[in-house]
Amino acid sequence: FMERYKDKQLSAYERAAALADTLSTEEQAQQLKYDAPAIEKAGLPSYNWWNEGLHGVARAGTATVFPQAIALAAAFDKDMMYRVGEVISTEARAMYNSAAKHGDTDIYKGLTLWAPNINIFRDPRWGRGHETYGEDPYLTSRLGVNFVKGIQGEEEYLRAAACAKHFAVHSGPESLRHEFDARVSEKDMEETYLPAFKALVKEGRVEGVMGAYNRVNGEPSCASEKLMGKLREWGFDGYFVSDCWAIRDFHTTHKITDTAPQSAAMALKAGCDVNCGNTYLHILAALEEGLITKQDIRTACIHALRTRIRLGQLDDN
């Protein structure tokens, strides 16, 4: 007898759903933290979703370091961006394999690379503008799509999972990002801030999207019905992750909720699958308060497990 989640004839979604349904609601909720515990009965080790690969595998030992993103963009060379992505994910996979042999599942050892940064660099005062490909939505789209394709590869499994960030309209000033409300016209959204994300989803099949800290037209990015609706419209079928501790900002700095369970519920119901931070520790409290359903938790868990299955983490080879 083979468990359904082990059946490679099934789609990644079907396998993820089958695995999720072997878990209790409490266990499903635990998988939504960025530092997810092991699922021992399935042979799935613990996993830390947080890894960086903007211009090289970051913070995890020796790796090739390419020029910063803004400098790579200055070459106007999309084929080069593909090759850069290929090198980064090959090294990330090698580091992951090496760490896994020793049971090391710490931060910066995983296959979910939170890159590229495809925000539009409009204001030179933004201290992280060098992480972007500049001010041009078209150039950002072309370079970003090729970087994602290089990262993810074209094999049966993803070599690594790229992540389009920060969705959306995130471009400083850095000191205001936790309470800032970006007021943007529909025209500017469609012409400036969304094209690169749309291209990475539709053309690049990017596996991850990260929500930003700021609000957009009053809605927090990690719980924005408008932004999540765009992802559904484009056919996104990966995982959505919050920027780190962004959901906590809902009740601490944006002041749009009163409590951590309310913030967790707002993000989860909108479609945020994985929480970088600790607010999703309050998911079960939100369930007890009637703010979310068990199905909300199950849906997010399936999305998270689907990505890990696409990375080959459930299969011996």
Name these PLM-found stretches.
Residues F1-N317:
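Glycoside hydrolase catalytic-domain context in secreted enzymes
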